[in-house]
């Protein structure tokens, strides 16, 4: 043990050798000696290099610290004597110094690795924040994102993590990120779904083609792996418009009611959403009907707003938002192959759109038409250009993939003398006095076509040609026009002139040379010409969009709100904030759910003061019957806060209420307690009615209250029902569609007012009252053997909101419901016949069947019915009709809850629609 003090002294002398900071040195020394001092006895601690001779090793006094590296062992014996430095061994000194340096460096790496890892994670998260953003509907290849990460680590001199660890780091920043495997079989790749590259990122231009001159500029990334599936509009089902400018942020000129403006904007957004839904479902012809109905059926109290310049400009902004979403929906930016039928439908839609808008705006302020039509024309032009380009792209793609065709084109274009064509191009500018340095010269034309030749040699795809054209237009048109102050339009005209002339001379040479690939090259040239025109028009449209943005900024109090209107993207879920005026009662807000209500007018002799509001009409043809002095029911209780629902689609859901009333939250809208509630009549009407007539006939009448639900229990056979979405149905009798129309076999109208309000002995005679017709304010009675049995007016009748609108014949209101509009929620299904679903054997068609209970039951009303079934107690038969009717009832139908839960509800068959009053629903039934 004699050499132990020498070894100890040697180690102490060797300690200052490593140049370490005091903190690190102290930390390393504590880790080097501290654990050994705690594990081993105070008398025996050894420090020696592994394999060092001369170190006396006692059996029970020797141990190996598990925290030390395998090449270093700590063994040292401490005694109470003084350390001596008189004997030194040079070899031991060197070995001890190296061992200590090696151990300290290794321990430094181990202790710092945790800190470095945390620091690197923070840097990575910050880098992700700066370069990427949550972007719904965007796919980013996982390999590209990891390549960006490796580049980031190289620049920051960090040790990159593996792909799996990097994936966990990404999910720390984007927890909702998902992965998808996209591409053809055998060539699919994993993609991150829901993340996109920020435009401010340095990686944006390296991934996306160019600066995005058109919607197709970034398609190279999206098409990675290749898409073979044809584009379908069904993939866009559920698309909803972004928020329109809010009336709360508008600066008005003059005295304008903010509530009216808010109502008008909300109505217009619902109208635009309806147009979008029909476009997604391919019902382009129906869009014309919606346009006509919205503008020609504008409520009178909102018409003055259409002359206000601020409101007109807001309409233009809303149109721009709608057209951008329509373009994104109809034409895929991925350049997927589109079915020929869809392309033809879009072309036809673009061809007719301007005429549809002009027709719908007749008899409205000219200022509104003058502002809307230029935006319409830009939309139509863009739609035509993009469909044309997409059609050419999917035709040219097979030619570019055919190696034989590509080789033939390269061989033929090599024989064309581009320099000789360039000299001819001087003729086009010989008389020009423009001496600007940025002018597009013949040399530029030769260079551009030489680049085209090189692309063909490289077997470039359509996406590669688009990327190249983006660069050409950016460098030779847009950039130069900004540098020398020349207008973009002048520069674009000059470029197109030279490009077209040079291309025509190339085709001329190919024709003279009998080029075998003339047809293929002509196709490629048409594709390039179309894209250049599209890029130019896109730049012009962007300038117009900026003008609209500036216009909106002028009218908005909050600049951020105006920018949000143009930067917002369409979504796939929607929850409307229904702002109800404080002065408007709950009765003034129309129930948008399917709550069928029987509306009974009070005759002029009835107390209540409703006589002047409702007029009777003599028997005759209802189609040509004039309506004079008619009063809007909606005006009695104040303006409605929401637009009406079509009488032909009262059972549908909408993007606002999303389903039946039973499923609506209390905050969305008022919940009516009884189906007999009439929302268009104000409460002050009821106190004017005598107490004895609360049941409209008498207190002992078998008829329930028609205008509102009574708090007390009514006498008679017909109980009240308070379930939402219910209607008071007839048990045995199914109503044909003629029940709702204005035509019957016999005398349809009875000019004789009711003689008394007492109960009748027969059910047939007791219905001697007048019902509101769904098409107009005509009244039906059911006296006579061939008369109608009455009509049910939905709470959303157009007459209650739009007034006396008789421009639309009855035949359009209750036409065929087979080709219905499908909303953003429900699926696309046609309406099957009732007999095929509920009665395939025609068992229910039994007129002699025994009546089971009272006329009114608690079963829900179906939306469609076929062959009517007669109740045994009715003396007068109802004319049978094969046409479908909207509201026919039978207790054979399943409950409403079952229909809603199993998805077989008639609400889905008729398919929901945003709440806009649709009056054009196809052809009429039998006698209309």
UniProtKB/Swiss-Prot annotation:
It comes from the Eukaryota. Residues 1-20, 50-98 are annotated as: Disordered. One of its GO terms (cellular component) is chromatin. It holds the Pfam family BCD_RFX. It is found in: Nucleus. InterPro entries: DNA-bd_RFX, RFX-like, WH-like_DNA-bd_sf, WH_DNA-bd_sf. It is linked to Mitchell-Riley syndrome: A disorder characterized by neonatal diabetes, hypoplastic or annular pancreas, duodenal and jejunal atresia, and absent gallbladder. There is no dysmorphic features. Interacts with RFX3. PANTHER family: DNA-BINDING PROTEIN RFX6, RFX TRANSCRIPTION FACTOR FAMILY. Belongs to the RFX family. This is DNA-binding protein RFX6. It comes from Homo sapiens (Human).
